[in-house]
């Protein structure tokens, strides 16, 4: 028995070795291989048919699983409906019956699909493994057939022929050929038949699935219609308890856009080619001022502004005002720009919103109000200041011209490069405010203070962004020129006593190194004069006169500060426009200056009820609603209190155009809303 098993095992091993050897020879090309291309095509079709059947079986199983899931979901849905259904409601038993029948239909549909389609598909795919094994066995028998054939050919072609071995090889060859032919013939007939039967199988399978699904949907539609009728009758019995979906809340009316419109951006004005290098042109129209923040409106020392572009190319320490010292006196120096370079003074909201209350005098005369300075007076350079049309106070031009120009040269004459260089060399660097008073006056020893701009409170009104050469230049006049100026004033004019007093005070202030520090330390109860300055910004547009409007309230407040100084108590303003050095004689005031000032004061009294202040329009604004004003650039609007706090908080103001008020005197008809950031304050 053991010998038999050993013989079978050895025989199988020998077959495997022969097959391996034959395959190696065929791969190396040393032995030919029997090929049947027709059969190979049958094999490829068989593999494709098997893959398609396997996928169809997988998808059908997934479909049946989904049907089972739908059955469970439908059953749970009907159970939940039966639980919430009240006993006294119509159709309680019908709802229960519909749920039970739906579950039966789902179960029947699933079972018929399993029996009619899935089992048939499993039977169809069950024949593929056997055929696949027979194809593999035929391949092995083909190798045995080729091996026996090659062995027989080798013996027959040998020189020394052994008949016994040749006859034995012939028997093995015939045996291998017979076995191979049996497998080959069966597969040659079976594979094409299997490939052709696939069409009928697909037809029967999907016809069965579609018919079962159509029957199921038809039967379950009857149950769904029955349930729909029950729910309809239940709703008719409880019509007063109908459920309605509430929509969005109704609109109460048009809402105003809370955000105020943004003003249009204007291009920077073109520089003038004839501008003097020691002058700075003001912008044609300042940028709109945004609403102040609470931190900017409270009293106290000014908040230091954020870093900004200075008029000069190089940022120097002398160009920055030190707001954190005890005296709050700005120190300003000049950096002369290059030839044919015009620097534009940009209006920053941080400087406009600064509160200059700390610069007011400590001692104010009784019955006089503090002079208010307009924002423009804090931002424009001194060389753009012009004389007020109300009253003209003569001034000495020598205090401005002695420092940088000869006596026979006007201030506005074009300077040469040589004069510019001399100016830079002649300008000393002033120390910071925290240095002792003796060191602060050392670079300017022997220089006197001028009439127009040497008052410490006027220096506070000069913006840090403007050229400060004017404050240094005013120290060039001597005490003798101040005495000559006092003598030149007319004796019969009401301004003479006041002017003389101002000159005496200027001379006394010049004798001390730090005028304001000495005043604060001594605590002398002497009265200070804060002249009101009217400024006319330069315009880059031809034919356009963009002039600062001086309001009546500002005129009255400014003149009340000056009135106690003179014997006649006249209202007057100091002229800050410099005059040439050779015109030392005083210029008398115009005949109608006092009348113009008085008429402005009378017009200020005829203002709308609740008048707050005036604003000037910087940009055109077209009204979008009937309660808004249509404004053009340059219009003056009289601001009155707003009826709605929401509009005021959103940046809207209420007012009436000054032209409409002067013409109609009807506030209720002509007032309207307008954006605050399109305007600037005039008072």
Curated annotation (Swiss-Prot):
Coiled-coil annotated residue ranges, if any: 10-83, 144-191
Modified residues (Phosphothreonine): 260, 280
Compositional bias annotation for Low complexity: 424-443, 468-477, 585-596
Biased composition annotated in UniProt, kind: Basic and acidic residues: 539-559
Disulfide-bonded cysteines: none
Domain of life: Eukaryota
Bilayer-spanning residue ranges: none
Membrane-topology annotation of the record: Peripheral membrane protein
CDD domains: BAR_Amphiphysin_I_II, SH3_Amphiphysin_I
Residue ranges, annotated region (Disordered): 244-311, 421-443, 455-599
Domain BAR: 24-240
Record's keyword terms, sorted: Coiled coil, Cytoplasm, Cytoplasmic vesicle, Cytoskeleton, Membrane, Phosphoprotein, SH3 domain, Synapse
Matching Pfam families: BAR
Positions carrying Phosphoserine: 252, 262, 268, 272, 276, 496, 626
GO biological process, one term: synaptic vesicle endocytosis
Stretches with biased composition (Pro residues): 261-274
A GO cellular component entry from the record: glutamatergic synapse
The name this protein goes by in its record: Amphiphysin
Species this chain originates from: Rattus norvegicus
């Amino acid at each position: 028995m053991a010998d038999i098993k050993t013989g079978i095992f050895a025989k199988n091993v020998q077959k495997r070795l022969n097959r391996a050897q034959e395959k190696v020879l065929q791969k190396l090309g040393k032995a030919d291989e029997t090929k049947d291309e027709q059969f190979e095509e049958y094999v490829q079709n068989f593999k494709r048919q098997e893959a398609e059947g396997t996928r169809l079986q997988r998808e059908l199983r997934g479909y049946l699983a989904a049907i089972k899931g739908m059955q469970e979901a439908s059953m749970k849905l009907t159970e939940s409906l039966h639980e919430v259904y009240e006993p006294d409601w119509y159709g309680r038993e019908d709802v229960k019956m519909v749920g039970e029948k739906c579950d039966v239909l789902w179960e029947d549909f699933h079972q018929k699909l399993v029996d009619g389609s899935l089992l048939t598909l499993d039977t169809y795919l069950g024949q593929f493994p056997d055929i696949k094994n027979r194809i593999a066995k035929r391949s092995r028998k083909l190798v045995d057939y080729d091996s026996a054939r090659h062995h027989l050919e080798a013996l027959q072609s040998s020189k020394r022929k052994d008949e016994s071995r040749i006859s034995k090889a012939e028997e093995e060859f015939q045996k291998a050929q017979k076995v191979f032919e049996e497998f080959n013939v069966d597969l040659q007939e079976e594979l094409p038949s299997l490939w052709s039967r696939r069409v009928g199988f697909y037809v029967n399978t999907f016809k069965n699935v579609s018919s079962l699904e159509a029957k199921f949907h038809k039967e379950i539609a009857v149950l769904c219609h029955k349930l729909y009728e029950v729910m309809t009758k239940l709703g008719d019995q409880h019509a007063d308890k109908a459920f309605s979906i509430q929509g969005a809340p109704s609109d109460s009316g048009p809402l105003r856009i809370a955000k105020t419109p943004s003003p249009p951006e204007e291009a920077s004005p073109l520089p003038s080619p004839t501008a003097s290098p020691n002058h700075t042109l003001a912008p044609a129209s300042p940028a709109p001022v945004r609403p102040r923040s609470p931190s900017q409106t409270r009293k106290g020392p000014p908040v230091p502004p954020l870093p900004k572009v200075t008029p000069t190319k190089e940022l120097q320490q002398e160009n920055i005002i030190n707001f954190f010292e005890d005296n709050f006196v700005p120190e300003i120096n000049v950096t002369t720009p290059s030839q044919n370079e015009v620097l534009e003074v940009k209006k920053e909201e941080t400087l406009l919103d600064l509160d200059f209350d700390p610069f007011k005098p400590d001692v104010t005369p009784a019955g006089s109000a503090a002079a208010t300075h307009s924002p423009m007076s804090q931002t424009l350079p001194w060389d753009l200041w012009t004389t007020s049309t109300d009253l003209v106070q003569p001034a000495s031009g020598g205090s401005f011209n002695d420092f940088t120009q000869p006596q026979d040269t006007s201030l506005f004459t074009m300077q040469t490069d040589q004069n510019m260089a001399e100016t830079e060399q002649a300008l000393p660097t002033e120390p910071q405010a925290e240095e002792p008073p003796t060191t602060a006056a050392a670079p300017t020893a022997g220089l006197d203070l001028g009439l127009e701009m040497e008052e410490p409170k006027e220096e506070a009104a000069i913006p840090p962004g403007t050229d400060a050469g004017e404050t240094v230049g005013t120290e060039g006049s001597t005490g003798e020129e101040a005495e000559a100026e006092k003598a030149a004033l007319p004796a019969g004019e009401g301004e003479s006593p006041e002017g003389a007093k101002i000159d005496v005070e200027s001379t006394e202030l010049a004798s001390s190194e730090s005028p304001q520090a000495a005043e604060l330390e001594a605590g002398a109860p002497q009265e200070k004069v804060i002249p009101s300055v009217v400024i006319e910004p330069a315009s880059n547009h031809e034919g356009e006169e963009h002039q600062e409007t001086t309001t009546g309230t500002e005129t009255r407040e400014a003149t009340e500060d000056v009135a106690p100084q003179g014997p006649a108590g006249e209202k007057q303003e100091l002229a800050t426009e410099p005059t040439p050095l050779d015109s030392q004689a005083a210029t008398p005031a115009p005949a109608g200056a006092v009348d113009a000032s008085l008429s402005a004061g009378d017009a200020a009294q005829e203002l709308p009820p609740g008048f707050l202040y005036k604003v000037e329009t910087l940009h055109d604004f077209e009204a979008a609603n009937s309660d808004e004003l249509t404004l053009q650039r340059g219009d003056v609007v009289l601001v009155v209190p707003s009826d709605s706090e929401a509009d005021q908080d959103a940046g809207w103001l209420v007012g009436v155009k000054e032209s409409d008020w002067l013409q109609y005197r009807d506030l209720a008809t002509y007032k309207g809303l307008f954006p605050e950031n399109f305007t600037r304050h005039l008072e």
